Amino acid sequence: MDNLARSVVNAIEAMEAVPLGDVKSFYGAGVYALYYTGDHQAYAELTAANSESLVQPIYVGKAVPKGGRRGREVMSRATTKALSSRIREHAKSVRTAENLDIADFRARWLVVEDIWIALGESAMIRRYRPVWNAVLDGYGNHDPGSGRINGKRSMWDTLHPGRTWAKKYPARDDTD
């Protein structure tokens, strides 16, 4: 299994990095990585690591076809736009953040068959421990809808305010 996971990781890393704000709609589901090169003080080490080439993602995620998470009949690669939709959702989150600039982000992705999606995502996270996956929780969150708000605002939304729906949550007092 390690060789298969490594193959998926290598394939993602070989993909051209596209400015996050320029990702167009395309068909497929799969795995993606986001990279940061900006000047936010919290990410100085990450920016330094990515100064010459993009070697350390800030976030890794996956997008499965509709129905895929629950084992239902899933849409085919040719009919789902799950991956581009998810990446573009992330672009919207970055754009709404008051202290981030979309121009400082790049994305790589790999369209794969459903069976490889979870393997690819977990292998990338294990390999890189991206800060928005492993340290600063909440970037990948969706608006939970009414009646489902429990807990406090995510650490990500506390450090990077701007997502309107995150303001529904009580503020955190443990993030400085």
Task: Show which residues each predicted segment covers.
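Boundary/linker segments flanking structured domains
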Residues: 1-58, 62-176
